[in-house]
Amino acid sequence: MVPLRSFVLLNGLFFVLLAARTVVTRVIDKDNLDGILETQDGQNLSKEPFNLEETYTADFLAYTFNGTWTSDTTIVYTDTMTGDILQFDVIKQRLTVIVDSSVMDDYIVTHYALSPKGRFLLIGYDFQKGFRHSKFMRYVIYDIELGGYDKIANGMHIALAKWAPLTDDLIYILDNDIYYMRFSNNGFNDVQRVTYDGIVGIVYNGVPDWVYEEEVFHGSSAIWFSPDGSHLAYASFDDRNVQEILYLHYGEPGNLVDQYPTEVKIKYPKAGTSNPVVSLTLVDLHDPTLNKIDLKAPIEVVGTDNVLSNVQWKDFDHVIAMWSNRVQNKTEIVWYNKYGEIVKTLDVVEHEGWVEIKNLFFYKDFVYMRKLQPSGTKAGRFHHVTRYDYTLRSSPIQMDLTPGITEVQDIRAIDHSHGRIYYLATGPGEPSQRNLYSVPVDGSEKPTCISCNVLTPEGNACTYADAIFSPFGQHYVLICQGPDPMIVGIFDNTHKKVYSWENNLSLRSKLARRELPLVKDLYVRANGYESKVRLFLPHNFDESKSYPMLVNVYAGPNTAKIIDVASYGYHAYMTTNRSVIYAYIDGRGSSNKGSKMLFEIYRKLGTVEVEDQISVTRKLQEMFPWIDSKRTGVWGWSYGGFCSAMILAKDLTSVFKCGIAVAPVSSWIYYDSIYTERYMGLPTPEDNLGGYNGTDVSRRVEDIRGKKFMLIHGSGDDNVHYQQSLALAKALEKADIMFEQITYTDEAHALFGVLPHLYHTMDRFWSDCFSLSHAH
């Protein structure tokens, strides 16, 4: 389960705008920018509140970086005005047209990729959706040098096509089998089939099945090239023993083609049931026989029912795999040579919770990883950049390079020429922030914050950043996402800004004409911990008045609602238009505050995080007379929908009057195995069946009686199945408890096709609950 914010951009918008502006509009127009900021400061414009329709449209989306580094000095991207594929030289600040848009005129292009040598253009078209990340497309290859087109797989829909590094060779996957395509100098290609046992929907080679795509790889690829492209590691998933989820697709109303509903079947392992059998294979692509080598899992450590959590290449000769036991509290990092022999291992065991390891980085005789380390405080351990000596020895020496109460969220790059490692982390004691830091690879100096010195056009220091480094770390794109609208710049490795890519002048101009909510951050002590709270207040807030409050909850393990990203979605509408206080609460189980608070949720989902939402809300009502305790509601989506329903079921003192659960989990026995067992263990009497039963909302419906409750779900949800809401609805109906229910026919988890109806439905619900006038 991925927090909805991961695919909902700016709170309520369920698509990602991939396009960026043309080169002309990326250049900073200082006069325009100064004029916009002067207008904001001078309050010269009449300002309007946000309207509901802007919650689900692209009106207040920020443009971001849409390029790809192809060398340490060049970026390739699409000019959205002309459709040309351009190359930008960041040193010379010069544009070159690589491919004219006319090359793609005959196709509705949804994907393209240049080959590493720049001769061929891979063009994907005729898109068909797979799961969350996967898609099926037809592909052609355009020969830029000779001008011809070549269909891949005779124009059939394929699941994946990817260029090999350094060469003009290609891997593609058709019907869950892997094919290797090589091109000669005259443009002709030769195709070899690598695997022969793929079965659509059952046995997957090189692409993940549903649960691995959703919960492990968070993407649609399960192939890993060696750095020179000569070898390929690929994962296979055998789902023959995995049980199926079945739901009906009803189709278009009145369409004779849909006279009978269509059955949709997906292999979907639920908690405690059979998982896919995963294997990892290595093949030498330059061997005419394509001989395969099995990279065996360390079953003596992780067991036979294991999870392949990550794969990467260390160098030309070694591939690394991370294998976990089924419940994911033990991980073995294994180094294999090209003959399939295990040459090194590293164990990571977590006794208080679960193991979470991301990519490793290498420098000389050391490996760098993100790992929990003691902080010397009551907060427990934090994820830090940790250096290991991976030379052969019985007990590798480790060094914590980033000590203290700072949470490293990801390692981004190593600059080998300067001996520094770059990473994203919170500031000390600032869990809502994320900045780019660097530290020497030997730990000889304290970390330095790189992005903290970047100022937004409004004059504020950047407090939430991301970075995309060039292949060898000589340049990087710095994306400042908050506290103000996004800015994007290109920097060299001395941190000198060499180009301003995007300043979002249009968005800033529109915001100058809008009322913005006031923001109040505070900590509230409840249940032995300090929970962080962010309140969005109406722009014309008056302490002498009383306002309804709406708590928006997610509260999934290791997530945070409160982050310093500038966004203008549903909360902006509710505060400026409906005069409702909008609240986020990050309590126990949330990220960035140390292992003690994080692991409080372990093996007991639906308990401590729910209790904190209730307790903190009660304290807020007691602290601030301007919060109307008789007009307080809660809503959430996915895990947040589960929490919304559980909050109403556990709220015995009427802290909340009403709530909405969108696409909720109602019982963890219905959700997928890899996510659920990571946090809950197994639903068996020997393990944690009692924990599962105790967190089943359908077993606790009696205390929802008397509260306004709305249950919303799409019948085509392949992630949190409609079964979850139907089970909860059945329990409510059996108990004769009144509630409202909305079913969105054939809609998936994001309800993308019905957003206007969804938000208008919720608006009417809050109007009734909070005694507001109905919006027009």
Curated annotation (Swiss-Prot):
GO molecular function annotations of the record: aminopeptidase activity; dipeptidyl-peptidase activity; serine-type peptidase activity
Disulphide-bridged cysteine pairs? 449-452, 462-480, 658-769
So what does this thing catalyse?
A: Release of an N-terminal dipeptide, Xaa-Yaa-|-Zaa-, from a polypeptide, preferentially when Yaa is Pro, provided Zaa is neither Pro nor hydroxyproline
Task: Give tissue specificity per the record.
Answer: Expressed by the venom gland.
Spell out where the chain is glycosylated: 44, 66, 329, 504, 577, 693
Q: Which UniProt keywords apply?
A: Allergen, Aminopeptidase, Disulfide bond, Glycoprotein, Hydrolase, Protease, Secreted, Signal
EC number(s) given by UniProt: 3.4.14.5
Positions of the catalytic residues: 638 (charge relay system), 717 (charge relay system), 749 (charge relay system)
Q: Which residues form the signal peptide?
A: 1-19
The keyword Transcription belongs to this UniProt entry's keyword annotation:
no
Does the keyword section mention Iron? no
Q: One GO CC annotation, please?
A: extracellular region
Please provide the Gene Ontology terms (biological process) for this protein.
proteolysis
Q: What is its main location?
A: secreted
Subcellular localization is given as: Secreted
Instruction: Spell out the family assignment given in the record's similarity comment.
Output: Belongs to the peptidase S9B family. DPPIV subfamily.
What is this protein's function? Venom dipeptidyl-peptidase which removes N-terminal dipeptides sequentially from polypeptides having unsubstituted N-termini provided that the penultimate residue is proline. May process venom proteins into their active forms and/or modulate the chemotactic activity of immune cells after the insect sting.
Protein name, per record: Venom dipeptidyl peptidase 4
